[in-house]
Amino acid sequence: MKILVINSGSSSIKFKLYDMSDESVICKGLIEQIGAKNSYAKIVTKTGEIAEKREEIPDHGTGIDVMNELLFNSHALTSLDEIDGVGHRVVQGADLFNDAVLVDDDVLQKIEELIPLAPLHNPAHLAGMKETLKVRPDIPNVAVFDTVFHQTMPKSSYMYPLPIEFYEKYKIRRYGAHGTSHQFVAKAGAKILGVDFDHFSCITLHLGNGASIAAIKNGKCIDTSMGLTPLEGLMMGTRCGSIDPAIVPFLMKNANLSGEEIDTIMNKKSGLLAIGGSNDMREIEARMDAGDENAKLAFEMFVLRIKKYIGAYISILGEINAIIFTAGIGENDARIREAVCSGLEIFGIRMDKDKNAAKKDEPRRVGLPETKVRIIIVPTDEELAIAEDTLRIINQSKK
């Protein structure tokens, strides 16, 4: 079976086509700058052949047409009939969805109702789904939500200590993000250690430009760092993470900033960028090595906040099998991994520096073998996880 995975952003479409008989990637591609006159489209086949084009792509509907054209011209497909299903990434499913679902009018309506909780993401996801269904309504489309894995959090974890009517009226609570990634790498970690996932407990660290951490007990998420939005939690590339909420009214009063301006600052002008001058950890480390004190401070703040969460999560999980690093920084930055694990020896976490420094693009253990808690690096593959969920939901619908 062939499954097409689509991730529609506000001005982009990323896609991957899988052969699910062996979970191999047939091709992958992206379309950028949708709405601009000089939009960019690219596809890469499994043999490494690349096709690119620049033309005006005014909207997502045209973007889907361009995607199909790329799929045909690259010979990844000869007909849309070859596609058995389409899986769509959806950032926010709130508490309306506790699993991936076949897309129908009711699902589209619910995703639209959740736009206030994800104003940058859900409209783009909707556009991708609607346009795909418009082209071939007979091909099953499945919505896979970033928030589903976090739906097992207990109420004590997801509620905020605010007036209860804010939750009842506006659904203000912790939803988390990166759930597809956290679940994927946790399952991979359990497989590496030969532990049944239902009896596997770990802490997963998705460290990229966006960063989050999750506490997983017996295969279920019981807490995560991101909240109502992806702004809460860890320090990130351009996001501040958790701060004193009183800073917002303070800035409104003393800096004469609007709520919208502060939201932009906290999402796009804070984090590593604000303190160290770059949202790229590689640049931060290069500046730090050159003697830049602000870059050093940014590095230390980033690590400290991760360690605080690890300590807190160990206290609520009790015994854990592993700490798992993933995403751009988590998978590739040995220096960050070593700094994060340094000082955690009291919890049975000890890094093997040689294994940690080795550069490999595969799941691997990097802790000392005699330690109680394993340290594992797992390259995340959210698209494959979406493809697997899509296939599962389609098969269930046939029973």
Curated annotation (Swiss-Prot):
It comes from the Bacteria. It is found in: Cytoplasm. Its EC number is 2.7.2.1. It is an enzyme of class 2 (transferase). The record marks 178, 239 as: Transition state stabilizer. It catalyses: acetate + ATP = acetyl phosphate + ADP. GO terms for molecular function: acetate kinase activity; ATP binding; magnesium ion binding. Substrate binds at residue 89. Mg(2+). Can also accept Mn(2+). CDD domains: ASKHA_NBD_AcK_PK. Keywords: ATP-binding, Cytoplasm, Kinase, Magnesium, Metal-binding, Nucleotide-binding, Transferase. Pfam families: Acetate_kinase. InterPro entries: Ac/propionate_kinase, Aliphatic_acid_kin_short-chain, Aliphatic_acid_kinase_CS, ATPase_NBD. Pathway: Metabolic intermediate biosynthesis; acetyl-CoA biosynthesis; acetyl-CoA from acetate: step 1/2. Its cofactor is Mg(2+); Mn(2+). GO terms for biological process: acetate metabolic process; acetyl-CoA biosynthetic process. Homodimer. Belongs to the acetokinase family. NCBIfam families: ackA. Catalyzes the formation of acetyl phosphate from acetate and ATP. Can also catalyze the reverse reaction. This is Acetate kinase. The gene is ackA.
